[in-house]
């Protein structure tokens, strides 16, 4: 199976609805049937609004453009909001999916996006300007994207932490 993974120079498009779309991978997959092999394509994409909203989609079809379109539509439907603070995260998070683990840390202004492959695409469409991310374990693009999104879903704002602990935000921030 050959996977075409697009990292730093992935094709990014901005739609008329203000969403940024990025293709992460396109796989050619085959199903073996009595008459031979049936080829199809599986596309993985992320969509973000540049202000903390992010979604991931996976589409399969007989032709590449159709699979890409399906992936983009699914990504738009499954978008969720991540709270950002000055273009970075509030705290360090760890995300897991399958054999992939990602460690995502906030970074100071001017650091930039220090992340590899699929994670970089996620942060760029999401609007994160400063972050340090490390992938551990499997480097499968699908698992990395899911692990990154699981970590981002687990991130909390200081107000949410304070509400859970029954304290004020000032007590949490020290």
From Swiss-Prot:
InterPro entries: Ribosomal_Su5_D2-typ_SF, Ribosomal_uS5, Ribosomal_uS5_bac-type, Ribosomal_uS5_C, Ribosomal_uS5_N, Ribosomal_uS5_N_CS, Ribsml_uS5_D2-typ_fold_subgr. Residues 19-82 form the S5 DRBM domain. The keyword 4Fe-4S does not apply. Keywords: Ribonucleoprotein, Ribosomal protein, RNA-binding, rRNA-binding. One of its GO terms (cellular component) is small ribosomal subunit. GO terms for biological process: translation. GO terms for molecular function: rRNA binding; structural constituent of ribosome. Pfam families: Ribosomal_S5, Ribosomal_S5_C. It comes from the Bacteria. Part of the 30S ribosomal subunit. Contacts proteins S4 and S8. With S4 and S12 plays an important role in translational accuracy. Belongs to the universal ribosomal protein uS5 family. The N-terminal domain interacts with the head of the 30S subunit; the C-terminal domain interacts with the body and contacts protein S4. The interaction surface between S4 and S5 is involved in control of translational fidelity. This is Small ribosomal subunit protein uS5. It comes from Bordetella pertussis (strain Tohama I / ATCC BAA-589 / NCTC 13251). The lineage of its organism: Bacteria, Pseudomonadati, Pseudomonadota, Betaproteobacteria, Burkholderiales. The gene is rpsE.
């Amino acid at each position: 199976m050959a996977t075409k993974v697009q990292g730093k120079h992935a094709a990014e498009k901005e739609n008329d609805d203000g969403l940024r779309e990025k293709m992460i991978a396109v796989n050619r997959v085959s199903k073996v049937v009595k008459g031979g092999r049936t080829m199809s394509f599986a596309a993985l994409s992320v969509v973000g609004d540049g202000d903390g909203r992010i979604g991931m989609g996976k589409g399969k079809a007989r032709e590449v453009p159709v699979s890409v379109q399906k992936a983009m539509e699914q990504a738009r439907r499954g978008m969720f909001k991540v709270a950002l603070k000055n273009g970075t995260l509030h705290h360090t998070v760890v995300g897991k999916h399958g054999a992939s683990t990602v460690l995502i840390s906030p970074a100071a202004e001017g650091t930039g996006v220090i992340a590899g492959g699929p994670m970089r695409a996620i942060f760029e469409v999401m609007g994160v300007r400063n972050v340090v991310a490390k992938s551990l374990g499997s480097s499968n693009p699908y698992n990395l994207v899911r692990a990154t999104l699981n970590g981002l879903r687990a991130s909390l704002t200081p107000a949410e932490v304070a509400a859970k602990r029954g304290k004020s935000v000032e007590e949490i921030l020290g």
